[in-house]
Amino acid sequence: MHYAGLETYPLLASMPYRKLVFYLLIAALFFAACLGIYQFGKHGKKLIDTLGRKNPLPAVSITFSAKSIVASTVVVLVLWLPWIAVEYPASIDWDTYNQLYQFFTPAPTYYSTMGTVFDAEYIDHHPVFDTLIFGSFVWLGNVVGSQNMGMFLYALLQCAFTAAALSLSCCYLDKLGVPKPIRLSLLVFVAIFPPIPNWAMCMCKDSLFSAVFILYFVAFIEIVRTKGAALGSKRFLACYVILSGLCILTKKPGVYIFILSGFVLLVVYRRFWKRTLVAL
């Protein structure tokens, strides 16, 4: 498999001074983004107030409730079905190939990414946690007579997990005062933008981490929104600890994300941590 770099794109490759053209395009996009932020700063409040008075599809509730999150997840999954069928059984990348090779091959293991042989069953170049998960589903496929079935089962579960995480994040925006038309638009985008289900059907560490990180980020925002009060709930605290652990286990940058964000929370909301530790 070959991944083409930016300079190999035909459009830019045929242009003189293509790097200059590329940087000018980036500068133009940056300027447009800054202009958009400036205009939103001037007129954003009025726009939000206007949208807040509108209630498109009154029968559809996009609020932070179990019923709304489940309903949104089901709708998203139904609209993802064509892409799930197209991607059957699943897509994988080279990292996953290496991880599956580790899972099914006893030591010593040749690791193509580093071009060497290791006298070890598993190599932590990619998270071992992910390797065990991916390998277990392919192994399960072997048990029932088809590796494709094992991969497809994993892809379906990851799609459901991703759809639930995205739906929850859209519904959570209600707590932040985001108008319903915007929440509805974001949910529709999640449901119909093809790269999202395509990504969710990929058996790779990045796809798994993405869904975990969405939930971790929502939990982080909830702590900030409540000024630390959310940490007083044992259920919320347990969810936050589990999500933090999954962030660390599913992708190595998750360690740094947790350390930096956790340090901020530990310092800013230390009184809630102390109270929680005493209660435990």
Regions found by a protein language model. Give the residues of each.
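Membrane-proximal lumenal/periplasmic loop motifs of glycosylation machinery
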Residues: 84-93, 104-162, 202
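Start-transfer (signal-anchor) and selected internal transmembrane alpha helices
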Residues: 1, 15-82
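Transmembrane and membrane-interface helices of multi-pass
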Residues: 63, 77-80, 159, 172-176, ...
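Membrane-interface alpha helices of multi-pass inner-membrane proteins
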Residues: 236-251, 262-263, 279
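Perimembrane helix-loop-helix junctions
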Residues: 257-279
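Transmembrane-helix motifs of polytopic, lipid-linked glycan transferases
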Residues: 156-177, 215
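Specific aromatic-rich, kink-prone transmembrane helix
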Residues: 104, 168, 208-228, 240, ...
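Multi-pass, polyprenyl lipid-linked donor-dependent membrane glycosyltransferases
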Residues: 94-97, 154, 160, 188-220, ...
